[in-house]
């Protein structure tokens, strides 16, 4: 949706240390005195192996809190919630629908990150190399047990929303299998997956049109 679309109350936000939360004070307001900084370094590596302190635990909770904030707005209809995002945002779409206090109507994850880690790490080198460099004394079995808490394949089992998802078959950042795994675990029968044979890690030109049509068909 856009700012002039009266059917939606749209909330765009950034998780900790990223984008809006990683910029100079002067870029936030004219007399700003405090910079917003990424204090986490490599997000995937931050507190790796610490289940309660890992970066993506906090990032997922940022999404949950964003929904709680929306619930305080008079313009929000909390019976009709939608989420969409690509790459990391695709993973966050799965996470917020799985963990939110409020059920989502539909979500649209595209070329989603954080899916099916054991196979993910066998397919491509990143983020496998980062994980293995930061796993310390953990065995591979222990590492995958830790990562299972943040795996979209497992989060998907908690989602009741309708889902429209997509993947590029040439994607070497978030390969197709890592997108198909969570999609297959979704309990809903109201789900559709689009494959783009020539596409890499990118958003299809027609994607926004597709997801908005999907969302509008499911509005109450």
Model-predicted regions and their roles:
Residues 169-174, 201-202:
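Acidic catalytic loop of the alpha/beta-hydrolase fold
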Residues 140-155:
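Active-site nucleophile elbow and catalytic-triad environment of alpha/beta-hydrolase enzymes
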Residues 161, 175-184:
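Short alpha-helix in the alpha/beta-hydrolase fold that links the catalytic acid
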Residues 159, 165-167:
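Short beta-strand/loop motif that positions the catalytic acidic residue
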Residues 180-220:
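C-terminal catalytic histidine-bearing segment of alpha/beta-hydrolase fold enzymes
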Residues 42-87:
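Gly/Ser-rich "nucleophile elbow"/oxyanion-hole loop immediately N-terminal to the catalytic nucleophile
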Residues 2-61, 119-126:
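Cap/lid segment of the alpha/beta-hydrolase catalytic domain
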Residues 92-139, 203-206:
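Hydrolase active-site cap/lid region
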């Amino acid at each position: 949706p856009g700012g002039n679309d009266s059917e939606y109350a749209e909330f765009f936000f950034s998780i900790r240390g990223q984008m809006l939360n990683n910029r100079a004070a002067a870029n936030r307001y004219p007399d700003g005195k405090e910079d917003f900084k990424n204090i986490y370094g490599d997000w995937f590596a931050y507190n790796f192996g610490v289940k309660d302190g890992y970066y993506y635990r906090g990032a997922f909770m940022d999404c949950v809190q964003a929904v709680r904030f929306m619930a305080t707005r008079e313009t929000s209809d909390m019976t009709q919630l939608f989420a969409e995002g690509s790459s990391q945002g695709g993973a966050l779409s799965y996470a917020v629908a799985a963990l939110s206090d409020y059920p989502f109507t539909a979500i649209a994850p595209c070329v989603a990150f954080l899916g099916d880690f054991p196979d993910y790490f066998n397919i491509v080198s990143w983020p496998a190399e980062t994980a293995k460099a930061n796993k310390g004394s953990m065995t591979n079995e222990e590492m995958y047990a830790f990562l299972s808490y943040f795996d979209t394949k497992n989060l998907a089992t908690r989602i009741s929303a309708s889902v429209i998802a997509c993947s590029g078959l040439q994607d070497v950042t978030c390969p197709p299998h890592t997108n198909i795994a969570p999609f297959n675990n979704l309990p809903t029968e109201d789900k559709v997956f689009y494959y783009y044979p020539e596409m890499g890690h990118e958003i299809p030109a027609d994607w926004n049109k597709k997801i908005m049509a999907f969302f509008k068909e499911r509005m109450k």
